Every structure is written in structure tokens, then in C-alpha cells.
């Protein structure tokens, strides 16, 4: 988006209505999905085992942190960074990860 008014309107919408509107739990996220594990996804896409363990994952457009929480939970060796246009939605993502013990409070 190059129109500042449009960007501000989108940010305002997501500040008011963080997405996705999933409940915030006081525990790690439930279940397992191979798509959230970088090694499984890498192997699926390339047909090879990853050659290294130290990895950085960018969750661009992380929204309320549902995907970020799974990425951190299923990839404890990785550095995971979530970014989003909406400060309000990022606050929800941070709370989600802190409450599920996936993020150290700062």
C-alpha cells in the first residue's frame, strides 16, 4: 500500500478488531501441524534434510500471533520475529505468546 490514508485505515481496523480473533490461552498451543515446524516444511519442499539448526523465522503479517505462537512452540531452536501493520494487533500477539510461555516479558 502506498496511500498513507489507506494504510492508516487498515491499521485502525486491525487495532479495533485484531485478527484472527482466537482465544488467548495460559498454556502452549494445542496440537501439531507439520507446516509450523520449519524442518518438516523444509524437507517437504526440498526433499532434503536441513543442513543447519540455527534459523531465523519472520512471521510477516503475524496478526494476533496465532501463527507466531505455533512457530515459537514448534521451533524452540529458532529465533522467531512477528511483524504487523497494527500496533493493537501486535499487543494481542505479545500477550498471547507471553501467556502461553512462548515469550519472555520485556
Swiss-Prot record:
Source species of the chain: Pseudanabaena tenuis (strain PCC 7409)
Superkingdom field: Bacteria
Matches recorded under SUPFAM superfamilies: S-adenosyl-L-methionine-dependent methyltransferases
Signal peptide: none
Gene3D superfamilies (alphabetical): Vaccinia Virus protein VP39
A GO MF label: methyltransferase activity
UniProt name for this protein: Uncharacterized phycocyanin operon protein W
GO cellular component annotations of the record: phycobilisome
Keywords from the named record: Antenna complex, Phycobilisome
Conditions for induction: Present in both red- and green-light-grown cells.
PANTHER family reported in the protein's UniProt record: METHYLTRANSFERASE, SLL0487 PROTEIN
Annotated Pfam families: Methyltransf_31
UniProt xrefs under CDD domains: AdoMet_MTases (cd02440)
Amino acid at each position: 500500500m502506498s496511500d498513507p490514508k489507506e494504510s492508516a485505515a487498515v491499521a485502525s481496523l486491525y487495532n479495533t478488531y485484531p485478527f484472527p480473533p482466537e482465544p488467548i490461552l495460559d498454556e502452549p498451543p494445542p496440537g501439531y501441524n507439520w507446516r509450523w515446524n520449519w524442518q518438516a516444511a523444509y524437507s517437504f519442499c526440498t526433499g532434503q534434510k536441513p543442513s543447519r539448526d540455527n534459523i531465523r523465522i519472520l512471521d510477516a503479517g503475524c496478526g494476533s500471533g496465532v501463527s507466531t505462537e505455533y512457530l515459537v512452540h514448534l521451533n524452540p531452536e529458532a529465533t522467531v520475529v512477528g511483524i504487523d501493520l497494527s500496533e493493537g494487533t501486535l499487543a494481542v500477539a505479545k500477550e498471547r505468546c507471553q501467556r502461553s510461555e512462548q515469550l519472555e516479558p520485556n
